[in-house]
């Protein structure tokens, strides 16, 4: 278990890249999709990740890639779904195809970092940042703010000062959703006020060239359409209100279909229309 606070559901198969690209093209043409985030798990464990990124790039989409980044340094173990190892992925190739590469940093020491992200060391994360900077990547550091690292935000900010390639620091309030995030919620829950205090510390201590992006739990409701490796399209099951409610903390999701379904775009259109209807 690599991340006991993870919100995600992990597919047990991998959808073929041409199918993913057809779906992405459909989202672009029908709904005006402009940006896509490729995440996981860790997308670098996908055998044809560079081919997938090139296909998305050729569609004219803005690509954000979120990865632990270990495979940039050498062969890396597969820690999410599956076993074995993945070969080293060339940072230069990924940087050339990605508009922004997000690397997690959830603490300034291994003791803090590994409360949330078990197998990533600070040394390895800093090595990944250095490698991406040399590759000319635009880098974003992602920090999940939880009860175990609120006192470490200033120290994390100090680590960022050594990298001019970091353009953004995203701070995410821990969300108690998904199979793991909900199960382990008591270990990580943080109030809105404590989150905003952590954001203020980040703004006060971050290097001047780094933009701070604060992502509260309530602010992320109903903002994402998620797709797992098997092609299942889903959203978290949450109340319609824009603020966070206690019932939003659950391990349920709303399954919409699969990217291979012939009517998947129609289903998404129906959901979009239902969400925009205003009662008389």
Identify the residue ranges that each predicted region occupies.
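Canonical Radical SAM [4Fe-4S] cluster-binding loop centered on the CxxxCxxC motif
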Residues: 1-19, 30-31
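Residue-level recognition of short loop/turn positions
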Residues: 2, 40, 68, 229-231
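Catalytic domains of carbohydrate-active enzymes, especially glycoside hydrolases
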Residues: 23-33
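Canonical radical SAM enzyme core domain
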Residues: 10-24, 41-98, 105-112, 119-124, ...
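Radical SAM enzyme [4Fe-4S]-AdoMet core and its adjacent flexible, acidic
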Residues: 15, 114-115, 119-126, 130-229, ...
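Structural preference for beta-strand elements that scaffold enzyme active sites
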Residues: 35-37, 62-64, 100-102, 138-142, ...
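Short loop/turn motifs at secondary-structure junctions
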Residues: 2, 32, 97, 164-168
